[in-house]
Amino acid sequence: MAAASSSDSDACGAESNEANSKWLDAHYDPMANIHTFSACLALADLHGDGEYKLVVGDLGPGGQQPRLKVLKGPLVMTESPLPALPAAAATFLMEQHEPRTPALALASGPCVYVYKNLRPYFKFSLPQLPPNPLEQDLWNQAKEDRIDPLTLKEMLESIRETAEEPLSIQSLRFLQLELSEMEAFVNQHKSNSIKRQTVITTMTTLKKNLADEDAVSCLVLGTENKELLVLDPEAFTILAKMSLPSVPVFLEVSGQFDVEFRLAAACRNGNIYILRRDSKHPKYCIELSAQPVGLIRVHKVLVVGSTQDSLHGFTHKGKKLWTVQMPAAILTMNLLEQHSRGLQAVMAGLANGEVRIYRDKALLNVIHTPDAVTSLCFGRYGREDNTLIMTTRGGGLIIKILKRTAVFVEGGSEVGPPPAQAMKLNVPRKTRLYVDQTLREREAGTAMHRAFQTDLYLLRLRAARAYLQALESSLSPLSTTAREPLKLHAVVQGLGPTFKLTLHLQNTSTTRPVLGLLVCFLYNEALYSLPRAFFKVPLLVPGLNYPLETFVESLSNKGISDIIKVLVLREGQSAPLLSAHVNMPGSEGLAAA
């Protein structure tokens, strides 16, 4: 009976969780064999029949056999191989003519493959880059048999380590060969011209001149050679080219190309760069404390996921608005946009099998999945508006549909005031002393305020006098004179009885070096012993930090500590330029003994 009642309660709990969920489980196939990420998912009405399909740039198991898949419902409708791993997929309108069927763009390697009605329409290739002159000269020598393959390999490895420009594909393949295969490779390819080709790292779309959903859009490409390219949607020519300090990995755009637009690029150096129309270089820079794993624009806020398991919100000018800590590592991110309710939120797939939905820093919903989610896509699928499509780390496919009655509220599924609001505070009772002090403040409030102001003015006066005295007697670790702009910083290391005292002396001048300085230590000789209490300072070059080290021996076995004064003087002068008081720690070594 106990077991039966337990199973009944579990079944009731599962039914109640399903009833309280905002999502309907439409499909789950753990063996769908789809390996991709969010940038390679796109939803579009590819045939103009009102039936939205899912476009997947599939990496294949283990990154082998990349393919372009188009799904209708839970089934794969078409499948075609790709020459290289896909980087991004996007759908866009190329022209205003009827019927207005969107085209599909798939970035793979150095090319963008454009499909219309799922048939190949156009192939755009990135322009070739000029080869490294040294690399070109080496292959010319190999062509004339002036160098052997082993020397060619050594020289190419030297160029790869020192040159800023990467080697060509031909040279990189040659460096991967065994010694026995090199000669045949050189004989086969030495007559070929050296070609250096970059690849596409990310892609998105930008409206051309109208903000409507069915307006013509341009393709925006991020490349491995730290450039952003904007392509014309009809002629596929380069309309604009922008340079970045690093390789872009995520892109977000807003506005129209012909009017005004903002472009945010998250790069491999951990920074986000903001560019505007007619700017060849970034206008703003957002420095992150960790590498970005996703970039989503929600209204006017840039939401960034980082490898520190956190979401950050920034303005387009780089001001941080908020930070939310995640319970696990972020694997993927995408935008959830519910047009019927005007909702925009961020979806984050975590390594612990959760998909969290946030509006700003407020948690709206948590979805638990049987496996970690690696890609997310939300939109119209089939003929259902609000459909969430997820692929898992093991290649599974999950499709959920948002209920029409579902309303996202802050705090997940909790509705109403938080539970802490109903708790009564433990307010202490009013004592006789509290009542007397309150009456005194009411009766003598003016006199108390005047007394406070008088004491405050005296405190400021004493602080100013002490500061002036410190400046006049050089009792500060910063020099205030223009002739010797110095900065002193002292660090004590060790447990005792021998301590290491390191003085960091820096010349803060911009152009003039400093010479002829002395360092003097003043200390209690009954407590401490120094091998050198007075020594000369070498030439101080502007801007460099000079560590000056010495050792301090503690002579007391009672754990007593004192202050050691450090003075920096000009040779031939008795007044110090600057000074520092070092609070020595107690000797733990002697105390333990």
From Swiss-Prot:
Gene designation: BBS1
Location of the protein in the cell: Cell projection, Cilium membrane; Cytoplasm; Cytoplasm, Cytoskeleton, Microtubule organizing center, Centrosome, Centriolar satellite
Signal peptide per UniProt: none
Function: The BBSome complex is thought to function as a coat complex required for sorting of specific membrane proteins to the primary cilia. The BBSome complex is required for ciliogenesis but is dispensable for centriolar satellite function. This ciliogenic function is mediated in part by the Rab8 GDP/GTP exchange factor, which localizes to the basal body and contacts the BBSome. Rab8(GTP) enters the primary cilium and promotes extension of the ciliary membrane.
Effect of P245L: In a patient with Bardet-Biedl syndrome
Tissue spec. comment: Highly expressed in the kidney. Also found in fetal tissue, testis, retina, adipose tissue, heart, skeletal muscle and pancreas.
Subunit details: Part of BBSome complex, that contains BBS1, BBS2, BBS4, BBS5, BBS7, BBS8/TTC8, BBS9 and BBIP10. Interacts with the C-terminus of RAB3IP. Interacts with CCDC28B and ALDOB. Interacts with PKD1.
Alphabetical keyword list: Acetylation, Bardet-Biedl syndrome, Cell membrane, Cell projection, Ciliopathy, Cilium, Cilium biogenesis/degradation, Cytoplasm, Cytoskeleton, Disease variant, Intellectual disability, Membrane, Obesity, Olfaction, Protein transport, Sensory transduction, Transport, Vision
Disease implication from the record: Ciliary dysfunction leads to a broad spectrum of disorders, collectively termed ciliopathies. Overlapping clinical features include retinal degeneration, renal cystic disease, skeletal abnormalities, fibrosis of various organ, and a complex range of anatomical and functional defects of the central and peripheral nervous system. The ciliopathy range of diseases includes Meckel-Gruber syndrome, Bardet-Biedl syndrome, Joubert syndrome, nephronophtisis, Senior-Loken syndrome, and Jeune asphyxiating thoracic dystrophy among others.
Organism: Homo sapiens
Residue list for modification N-acetylalanine: A2
GO biological process: adult behavior; brain morphogenesis; cartilage development; cerebral cortex development; cilium assembly; dendrite development; fat cell differentiation; fertilization
InterPro entries, sorted: BBS1, BBS1_N, GAE_BBS1, Quinoprotein_ADH-like_sf
Protein name stated in the entry: BBSome complex member BBS1
Gene Ontology CC terms, in alphabetical order: axoneme; BBSome; centriolar satellite; centrosome; ciliary membrane; cytosol; motile cilium
